[in-house]
Design a protein with these regions (language model features):
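Positively charged n-region of N-terminal signal peptides that target proteins for export
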Residues: 1-6
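N-terminal capping segments
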Residues: 7-70
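Terminal low-complexity, poorly structured segments
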Residues: 9, 75-78, 141
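Short, intrinsically disordered low-complexity segments
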Residues: 25-27, 92, 145
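Generic alpha-helical secondary structure signal
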Residues: 42, 58, 79-81, 139
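...with weaker cross-activation on analogous glycine-rich loops/strands in unrelated enzymes
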Residues: 67-132, 136
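Low-complexity, Gly/Ser/Thr/Pro-rich intrinsically disordered linker/tail segments
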Residues: 140-149
Length: 149
């Protein structure tokens, strides 16, 4: 067997494995209340720069076994693969909704937070959806995502 056939064979196997994993993860039972309760209970008094880690752990607590995450902005692409859909009305928040901000300025990894029913929470309890003046920029992209709609 030549090297090209081996590469093609492993690529097919890898794609099949990833596809099976995504189907499994999409079918997991999502409990947004448990996720929001977890992120709220574990929030720090102020930001420690680990928003993606804290929200990922909340997602796991909500029933989706997500063991590897990336930076905050990567969740804009990962969450739709897990069955989350973008919502357009920023005032139509529901418990468990997740907001993801693009990297901007010195915020190299973006920002991510979860709505707990009364406030946005990441690695700390936020006063509002905008946690830094960099995100007030009109060109700053963000997405609010919700599972199951």
């Amino acid at each position: 067997m030549n090297i090209l056939k081996v590469i093609i064979w492993f690529t097919i196997l890898w794609v099949a494995l990833v596809t099976c994993c995504l189907f499994y993860l999409r079918s997991c039972e999502w409990n947004p209340e448990k996720a929001a309760e977890y992120v709220t209970r574990n929030a720090e008094n102020k930001s420690v720069g680990l928003c993606a880690k804290y929200v990922r752990k909340a997602i796991v607590a909500g029933g989706i076994p997500l063991y590897q995450g990336g930076d905050a902005w990567s969740y804009k692409y990962l969450l739709p693969m897990l069955g989350f859909k973008r919502i357009e009305n920023v005032n139509d928040k529901k418990v468990g909704d997740i907001v993801v901000f693009q990297p901007i300025g010195k915020r190299y990894f973006g920002h991510i937070a979860m709505w707990n029913g009364s406030q946005w929470v990441s690695d700390f309890k936020q006063r509002n959806i905008i946690v830094h003046s960099d995100y007030r920029n009109d060109s700053c992209e963000f997405a609010i995502l919700r599972k199951g709609e």
